[in-house]
Amino acid sequence: MKRLQAFKFQLRPGGQQECEMRRFAGACCFVFNRALARQNENHEAGNKYIPYGKMASWLVEWKNATETQWLKDSPSQPLQQSLKDLERAYKNFFRKRAAFPRFKKRGQNDAFRYPQGVKLDQENSRIFLPKLGWMRYRNSRQVTGVVKNVTVSQSCGKWYISIQTESEVSTPVHPSASMIGLDAGVAKLATLSDGTVFGPVNSFQKNQKTLARLQRQLSRRVKFSNNWQKQKRKIQRLHSRIA
């Protein structure tokens, strides 16, 4: 059977590459929001949903328009993928799997995706991304399978890359016929039916004082200033470690 697997690593971009990634993520956010706005206008006029094929022609139109020619500086594939994300959001809404698509806010969950054109050099811990060039990453494990797509995202002030691969694996056959029960709790992380007990990690308690100190420092900063943003990223990184 075929198995899809994701490998996530922290990127180590240069200063210019980081600026470009922010710009690409902003362009994808712009395309998604502008297409959603046009879909809303179309719906208010009493017309049916416009599929991806037509939305792709909007992207060509926007690239040629004087006020949005800056979209040409971003790679085409991630911009197209943002339109496919919007199409997927509408399909999930029509099938009652999700709420109606909402506008994205720049700076929150920044991400963009490459379906192809990526080169992976695991031996030297680097990856090639169109219009970004070669970039190093923290190589913590071997990537196996055929690369299907690559997603670049930002979290807690750092950039990450998620490589999705496809590989052929044999169907697993469990040799045992016995079963075991598991009870998850708060005081005890897990208790097995054979009496084995796993204690809690208590990562929050270990970092509670540090978190309180950082939050006090944040309250003294001028909201939305550079120092406030830096302090907020420190808190986000600590929350990431706790999780």
Feature names for model-found ranges:
Residues 1-243:
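Nucleic-acid substrate recognition interfaces
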